[in-house]
Amino acid sequence: MNRRRSASAAVLLALLLPLPLAAAGTSVAADSPSAAESRRAAVELPRPTGRFSVGQETLHLVDRSRTDPWAQSGPRELMVTMRYPAQRGTGAPVHYLTSEEARLLLIDRGLDKAIPVETLAGTAAHSRSNARPVAGRYPLIVLSPGYTVHRATLTALAEDLASRGYVVAAVDHAYESVGTAFPGGRVLECLACDKTEEGGTPMRAVSDNRGRDVSFLLDRLTGRHPAWRHAGLIDQSRIAMAGHSIGGASAVAAMATDPRIRAGVNMDGGLHTPVPEAGLGGRPFMLLGEQKSGPGGMSSWDRDWPLLDGWKRWITFADSGHFTFSDFPAIAEQLGLPDPEAPLPGTRSVELTRRYVGAFFDQHLKGKPQPLLDGPTPDAPEVRFHTP
């Protein structure tokens, strides 16, 4: 199967294009002037809700002990966006994506004629590059994105967590997105997609490799000679991971082999790497899914739910889709491109994702009890708790 029509790509295309536009043979030129103009307007992610401003720095990490599994030559490489509590009024504005990253993403989704490159690339975020950190010791959260998509797609969640007093490391795994910029003018495309969709490589190879990537990242952030100049901000006793789609499956893979990761969140990812039969050592884990991911809707969750041997929750959002947990609904909403099959508004998608993921980490990394996680609440009627 061509990756441009893979399941994840099809879902994203449905998210960003209303059905009349997605129909074969329909021309984007049929848009009304107001709709077309909206796609050239400035797009802004929802503002973070915490008390801190957010700083941002980018790391390029090279694991010379491993050969890249997709290129099958050269060392394994990662691009990492670090976000952290920062002093107000310091730092400079950041870019959401480079023009080439945005161009490749739009082409892959069949949206290059509908959305200008500069609109997506110029999406306004709220981090500040090289901002001065607020002194302290903060829990570390690793974020891993969905298959084929850039780490920037988790920006709204990452910024909110940093504003609430976390250090956040969002990872791009080489050759696993349709386009990620690396040093030296390189833009690495999705070699992994060809191998998994056309070459017979199982998706478990992706999540297992990402688990190893995360352990290497933790080594470089918490070792004797850390790769990040602000590594002293990290409380090494409080580390967790969350991921979207294959990134969520990778949280299980990482936790299964790395005891440093104290808690995990899987946002609508099939568990290609199963939970070990012995469990996760009693560590807390949350399954957070779209409307169709309740019991009976996600077979690997049904299979592995009994193996989660610590505090656990299985939560879904009504009217949501696979990409609800990323930035895409908020961006699509502002561009006049809602998804009729996942009508949860974009701003509400971001709000709920931030609230429940943030509450999980506040409870399990900061020791702050969160009644929000005990069951349904009147102010969140979209949220379903499942106890199979």
Sequence positions of predicted segments:
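Gly/Ser-rich "nucleophile elbow"/oxyanion-hole loop immediately N-terminal to the catalytic nucleophile
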Residues: 131-137, 182-242
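The feature captures the conserved acid-bearing segment of alpha/beta-hydrolase catalytic domains
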Residues: 262-324
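Domain-level recognition of soluble alpha/beta enzyme cores
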Residues: 34-141, 342-346
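Short substrate-entry loop that stabilizes the transition state in hydrolases
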Residues: 122-181, 293-297
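Secretory targeting and sorting signals
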Residues: 2-30
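Primarily recognizes the serine-hydrolase "nucleophile elbow" in alpha/beta-hydrolase
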Residues: 217-281
